[in-house]
Amino acid sequence: MNLAAIVLAGVVSTVAIQTQQVPDRAPECLALNMYYEARSQGTAGLFAVSAVVLNRVNDSRFPNSVCEVVEQGPIRESWKTRQHKNLSSSKRKYYPIKNRCQFSWYCDGKSDVPRNKKKYQELLDLSKSIMYNEISFVDVTDGALFYHADYVTPGWAKTKQKTIEIQDHIFYRWNTK
């Protein structure tokens, strides 16, 4: 199924992503994910990347908040706090383990502060519109929970069902065969 057919189907039968109460950081987490995963893409690419996050929030196999989905991955304690045995748990610092997160930008060791403030603000406004149901959000991925760039072939891809290709990403869901 091509993108035009999916968008048309979505307009006819809009898939509503349930976002009853929006936690404070949810729009920021979604905007950061759009920024680092699809900022140079058009609306379809931004919606597709966002749909994967929101589909995961609504799937019991993943964390149930936007930020927990975006930040999902193993963590380790900082060497600075690990050396102090009597330090309270609230004062300990934890960081994601490099290159082991669900979304690579979150644990690539680089700053997560967007350089292009104007673009980030546009994406933050879009994510707020999505989260607060101010715009009609169509899941153009047909329920995808996974994606990767089209220039890589991860081992997990052959165990999933491909749903669509949008710009430079390929989207998948659990294999239902």
What are these model-predicted stretches?
Residues L8, T14-K177:
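Bacterial extracytoplasmic/cell-wall-associated proteins, especially those involved in peptidoglycan
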Residues M1-A9:
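Sec-dependent signal peptide recognition
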